[in-house]
């Protein structure tokens, strides 16, 4: 059982690493900054592969009542905001910077649980939230590659991620499984982004993309869709088999490896102050793992 869990964790880390680095390559190196098309393609591939997996009997999809589907639509709308704003932010920000800002969503979730749901929060989790918030708050002032648009889209991404987590927790228990929820997210995102591609200008703007007929662009886009699907699948499996503390530990491991390799593969200006922000954010996330492990033990 321990070997199986370790293999699952390593599979998740590999998918996490490959998916984020591939997306960063398409967005920042090839500069395919048309999120309605890029994310629409990824959700199309994800939905198609998930449907094929269901037909082959590899995953279970349940026939849900229309009322449950309608109740889930606000979460699907937030999912669109997550992937759209995340794509815009990642195209302009370094991967470690994006991760530090993304972690603020945990602060929003923690604050909502304590202030609105009146849940008991451990001291380690409060300290974790403060460290994550401090790291993200100091980073814009120390980032030598500061990009206002990148940070703006990161804020929208943070809000959508935090709201999605809160909404998802408030709907438990639900007849929709994690796979059912993701399938609905894929369908809703694919349809909405397809309709949005024309008014946003992405549909015709992409015709002027310089690498439109290059194999490396086609290969990278195909890889991003497939890797995104396997990342989703491995994440669902990880959360269904492992305790929350163990899941958080694997996610932290995946983020550290991905952030470290991204600094070697993509251009990034490092200063002592930015490294300090990264370390503070890492400490905050390590404390979050510790608090999750204590609460689940």
Curated annotation (Swiss-Prot):
It is found in: Golgi apparatus, cis-Golgi network membrane. One of its GO terms (biological process) is UDP-N-acetylglucosamine transmembrane transport. Widely expressed with high expression in lung. Coiled coil: none annotated. The keyword Amino-acid biosynthesis does not apply. Disruption phenotype: Deficient mice are grossly normal and show similar body weight, total cholesterol in serum and triglyceride in serum with wild-type mice. However, Tmem241 ablation causes ectopic cholesterol accumulation in lung cells, lung inflammatory infiltration and hypokinesia. It is a multi-pass membrane protein. InterPro entries: TPT_transporter (IPR050186). The chain crosses the membrane at residues 7-29, 32-52, 69-89, 93-113, 121-141, 146-166, 187-207, 211-231, 250-270, 271-291. GO terms for cellular component: Golgi apparatus; membrane. Disulfide bonds: none annotated. The keyword Cytoplasm does not apply. Keywords: Golgi apparatus, Membrane, Sugar transport, Transmembrane, Transmembrane helix, Transport. GO terms for molecular function: UDP-N-acetylglucosamine transmembrane transporter activity. Belongs to the nucleotide-sugar transporter family. SLC35A subfamily. Golgi-localized UDP-N-acetylglucosamine (UDP-GlcNAc) transporter that transports UDP-N-acetylglucosamine into Golgi lumen. Contributes to lysosomal targeting of NPC2, a key protein required for lysosomal cholesterol exiting, and that utilizes the mannose-6-phosphate (M6P) modification pathway for its lysosomal targeting. This is UDP-N-acetylglucosamine transporter TMEM241.
